[in-house]
Amino acid sequence: MGLLTFSINLTLDGCIDHQEGIADDETHAFFTRLMDEGGAMLWGRVTYEMMEGYWPAVARGDVAAPPAIREWAVKLEAKPKYVVSSTREDFPWTHSHHITGDLRAGVQKLKDATPNGVLLGSGKLAAELDRMDLIDEYKLLVHPRIAGHGPTLYESGLPSTRRLELISATPLRCGAVAMHYRRAG
């Protein structure tokens, strides 16, 4: 069984608005390494739609992009992508699959079938899966910014405090810190 690893950009005040993160070669290389380590991507519909509107064009070369960003796009194009949605059924992007029915069972089945693990990259979906105790590790890229607005991570709350064990904290040149945690005991 593979691990479910939640990874996202966030500011010091917990904002997960994708426009608030630092998008440079180093941060893209960080996420490319994470994607290389995992066997599949898992997103909610909103994240999928944001991604499908841009990254396939970068992978095809229709949009000019620096080498690190193009590398991310090409690898993402080839990666299996699983989407949780109750409002959309058609996901035409290459290697995209719809998780339907019982969320807990569907995600557990995906973990069981993906020995290299699943990389989860949607904030709202992460909160829901964390309430189900399905997330095994957290690889967060914390940016040196205070956004002062939302959306924020876990704004819908959890039933109790989640205790984590720090595995590593790695500063990047841009001032962001890559934090790696796993669930404690």
Feature annotation, model-predicted:
Residues 1-185:
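Enzymes that bind and transform nitrogen-containing heteroaromatic metabolites
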